[in-house]
Structures are given as C-alpha cells and as structure tokens.
A protein has these predicted regions:
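Short, acidic Ser/Thr/Gly-rich low-complexity loop/linker segments typical of extracellular
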Residues: 3-26
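Short Pro-Gly-centered beta-turn/loop motif in secreted/extracellular proteins
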Residues: 24-34
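N-terminal active-site segment of His-dependent metallophosphoesterases
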Residues: 30, 41-135
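Extended active-site neighborhood of metal-dependent phosphoesterases/phosphodiesterases
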Residues: 41, 52-56, 134-252, 278, ...
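Active-site glycine-centered loops adjacent to acidic/histidine catalytic or metal-binding residues
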Residues: 86, 126-127, 165-166, 263, ...
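Short, well-ordered beta-to-alpha junction loops that form the rim of enzyme active sites
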Residues: 210, 261-266, 303-304
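Short acidic, glycine-rich surface-loop motifs adjacent to enzyme active sites
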Residues: 249-274
Length: 337
C-alpha cells in the first residue's frame, strides 16, 4: 500500500507522494540519484547495514524512469543515534591491519552492545576511506562496501547512514568545471546521496556534505602518487545544496528539534568564531541563517580527530556544535583502545 505525504528528492527538488503513494519529479539529474526523506514512524530496509532509501538514475535528462521505495512502519519515537567519524580505512601494512582492527574493535563492540535492540542508527560523518590509499592500497568505498562487506560494516546491528568527508572524494578527478560534483561520483555510486534528511521519531536529522573540493595542483603534495591534484578543498556548501536545505526545512515545524551532521566543524577550535576552513563568510552565514528560527539545533561534526563542545557564536542559545573524535584513534597505529 502506498504512503501519502512522503517526501522524495533528487538532491535539488523535493516532491510529495499523493494519496496512492505516487510521486513525480522533474530532474536535471545533476546528482544522478533519487531518494526518500524518511518520514517519522517508518524505517527502510537494510542491506549489509546500508539503508535502502535511494536509487541511481541515468544521466539522460529526457528519459523517464520509475523508482519505488519500501517503507516499514516503526514506532521510533524512542531511538538510539550512534555517531562515527574519521574511520580512515586504508589497508596499510599495519599489524594488525586497520580493517581488522575496525572489525574486531568498533564493529564487534556495536554488535555486542546493540544486537536485539530496536531503532538503532549509526551516522557516519565522513572520511570512512582515505583518498590517497584508494589507488595505492586498493581501498576505496567500493572495496569496503561491495567487494568485501563481511570485512567491514556488514553485520552491524544498526543502519549505517553516511555523508562525505574530504578524503571520500576521488583525487584522480582533474580540476576544472564542477570538479566537486565529479569527485564525489564514486561515493554517490557506492554509498548514495551526499546530502540527506530523515525524520526519526520527533526529531529531524540531516547529513550534509560541507566539502567544496577543487583538487588543484601546486606540486607541493608528494603524498598523492599519480593523482591529478593535491586533494585540496574549502569548507562550504554548494549553492544548489543551500537551496535544497531551505526546501527541506520548509516542511519542518520550527519547534521540531534538528540535528545536523557534517564532516568539517562550523566553529573554530576555541568557539570564538566560524571555522577558518569556511573561507567564504557569506556561504557560512547563509547556511547558519537557514536554521536561526528553529527552537533547538545541534550540529555534529568530525574532521579534527578531537572532541569538543561549543555554542555557535552569534546565534543565541539554540545552536550548539558537538565535534566528535576519530574512530581511527591515532590512525590505527596505537595499541591503546
């Protein structure tokens, strides 16, 4: 039976299902995906710990296609959110190997703690892989999630929802027009959309890509093997993503608590100002202003491999940031856990 009022999106436009659960969306297929914004009271099926909420589209803007999604009714007002970031699987010659450490440590701990519990979700805030090792050690997202799923997240007793980090971009993408979109192509093909939203219980969650990747070449980075550039980037949001965020939030009541996950922190380390990596002040301000009228907004971020809590300066008491430490610890090179 179709579900009425469910939001669907291509990462730019947003549409709503009719009384029969049907939707229609005209798309320029920029992101080559279509997906569901999870409605409250529902879950989606899981395959190897990955939520099945999206589908890949063709690049032909004139072709039509039908993509159906399964929703499973769930009483998820009471739920558990786990946050993981900076896992950095590299397949380097460590003893034990980092993938083995990840499986025997992080994955097994979650299995022993959460198996049998309902409505558990894990948010991955980026840098699951590590770009310079994609080609050096054959360890990209594809190897982690497709060719060897039993070695990594398969078996987790929770759904593994993700967004990108800077190291999840493909450094073999030549710089130039829309390099940010092109470099995220492997991620979108393997993992799914780079910016997503979901309503779980009475909370609205968003996972956003805040990496503007340009991969310029200065000749200064000797660590990138045969890549086309230096894997460099700025923090920020694509204009079409800012528009999408605004459209998504137009469906959210101002009193609804919001949790926003992304990779790069919004706030500088001492909490005094915006993070310097957001070098475009107007982009940062435009993003923050989208949330200023909501009663309670919490941002969860990674990237620094440190743990900090701070209020967002200039936005009263309704916005806080929780910067989360790295799953990889000291790059998987320490015996301490």
């Amino acid at each position: 039976k179709g579900v009425e009022g469910v939001l669907g999106t291509d990462g730019i436009g947003i549409t709503k299902t009719d009384a029969k659960g049907h939707y229609w969306l005209k798309s320029n297929k920029c992101y080559e995906v279509v997906y569901v914004i999870l409605p409250s009271g529902y879950n989606v099926p899981t395959q190897a710990a990955m939520p099945k909420f999206w589908a890949q589209t063709s690049t032909d803007v004139d072709s039509e296609a039908q993509h159906d999604f399964e929703l499973i009714q769930a009483s998820n007002d009471n739920h558990t959110i786990l946050v993981a970031t900076d896992i950095h699987l590299t397949n380097r010659n460590l003893s034990p190997n980092d993938r083995q450490q990840f499986r025997e440590g992080f994955v097994n701990e979650l299995i022993s703690t959460y198996t049998g519990k309902q409505n558990v979700y894990c948010f991955n805030l980026g840098d699951f892989a590590h770009d310079i090792h994609w080609y050096r050690n054959d360890i990209g997202w594809a190897e982690s999630l497709n060719n060897h799923p039993s070695d990594d997240i398969n078996g987790l007793p929770c759904q593994f929802w993700s967004t990108m980090g800077n190291h999840d971009n493909d450094g073999h993408t030549p710089s130039g027009d829309d390099v940010d979109l092109r470099a995220s192509g492997p991620y979108r093909k393997m993992v799914g959309p780079t910016h997503i939203a979901m309503n779980i219980g009475k909370i609205h969650y968003m996972l956003l890509d805040d990496i503007l990747y340009y991969n310029g070449y200065t000749g200064s980075n000797s660590n990138v093997d045969s890549q086309f550039g230096d894997c460099n980037y700025n923090a920020g949001f694509r204009p079409d993503m800012l528009t999408w965020i605004e459209r998504d939030l137009s469906y959210v009541d101002k009193n609804t608590p919001i949790v926003v996950g992304m990779h790069i922190p919004l706030v500088n380390w001492d909490g005094s100002s915006r993070n310097y990596e957001f070098n475009n002040t107007s982009n940062w301000t435009s993003f923050m202003n989208l949330f200023k009228d909501f009663k309670e907004v919490n941002f969860i971020t990674g990237h620094t491999h440190q743990t900090r809590f701070r209020a967002v300066p200039g936005y009263g008491t309704n916005m806080d940031e929780h910067n989360i430490g790295a799953v990889c610890g000291v790059w998987w090179s320490s015996s301490a856990r």
